[in-house]
């Protein structure tokens, strides 16, 4: 580019074939570049109250934290757990859910392994919460997979929301089940319960190998971008001068580069798409 406005703008490739609407993604990225992010986003970490597992989860703002959030539920909604027949279920399922791109092995010998990613998104709701907005991004590879599993679990408990994971990397799902949180793991949304395999009934989750799932995952992101990202100049979904609300630049840039035939390195796209599904 001859006159780039920002560093990310300088290396932008707008000619390349992208699956998603690049115009909207870049409108949103450029708009976000003008914001003071500290006013919209908090960095921090989750921990169990007094270090005792399976009690309450506490959120602590922390510049070294791996979580970025743009919305926190009010106190009454935090740690909202429902006990049914002695099993734990998320109490804020009507407000939103998580999507997760997990990994199973701790170290990677050659090169850099892909990160684990967690995305949280609200749905349309009448509670004191934003609607159809991403509110949490976590893209990290802590030293061990166990730390990652525990951090994901704490986020789910704190927000009281269920999570959709890929079940071809089942360790995270076993972590949930063994700790009594099977009720937090969403069953694959594209099949009825009696059509699920034995493992899917046991753990929840969705396979990422089938073409159908890849397609519906990509079209979930595509339609989210059309409705909620950048400017809607035609005014199909909102006023034409209303900028979308999507503060997570990492996820936006991941969407811009996303390649459906080589999904492995796009952690944020995988997790955000699962959250939308």
PLM feature segments, named:
Residues 1-188, 227-277:
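RNase H-like, metal-dependent nuclease domains and their acidic two-metal-ion catalytic environment used
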Residues 185-234:
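Short alpha-helix plus adjacent loop in nuclease-associated cores
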């Amino acid at each position: 580019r001859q006159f780039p406005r920002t560093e990310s703008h300088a290396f932008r490739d707008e000619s390349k074939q992208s699956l998603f609407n690049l115009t909207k993604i870049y409108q949103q990225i450029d708009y976000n570049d003008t914001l003071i992010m500290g006013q919209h986003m908090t960095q921090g970490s989750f921990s169990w109250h007094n270090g005792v597992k399976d009690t309450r989860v506490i959120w602590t703002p922390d510049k070294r934290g791996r979580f970025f959030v743009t919305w926190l539920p009010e106190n009454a909604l935090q740690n909202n757990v429902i006990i049914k027949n002695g099993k734990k279920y998320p109490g804020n399922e009507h407000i939103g859910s998580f999507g997760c791109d997990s990994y199973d092995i701790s170290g990677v010998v050659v090169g850099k392994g892909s990160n684990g990613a967690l995305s949280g998104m609200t749905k349309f709701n009448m509670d004191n919460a934003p609607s159809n907005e991403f509110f949490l991004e976590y893209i990290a590879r802590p030293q061990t997979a166990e730390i990652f599993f525990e951090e994901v679990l704490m986020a789910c408990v704190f927000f009281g929301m269920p999570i959709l994971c890929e079940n071809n990397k089942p360790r995270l799902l076993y972590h949930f089940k063994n700790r009594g949180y099977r009720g937090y793991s969403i069953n694959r949304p594209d099949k009825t319960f009696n059509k699920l395999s034995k493992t899917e009934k046991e753990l929840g989750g969705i396979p990422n190998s089938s073409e159908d799932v890849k397609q519906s995952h990509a079209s979930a992101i595509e339609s989210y971008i059309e409705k909620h990202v950048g400017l809607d100049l035609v005014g199909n979904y909102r006023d034409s001068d209303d900028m979308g609300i999507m503060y997570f630049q990492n996820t936006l840039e991941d969407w811009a580069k996303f390649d459906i035939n080589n999904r492995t390195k796009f952690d944020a796209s995988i997790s955000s798409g699962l959250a939308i599904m």
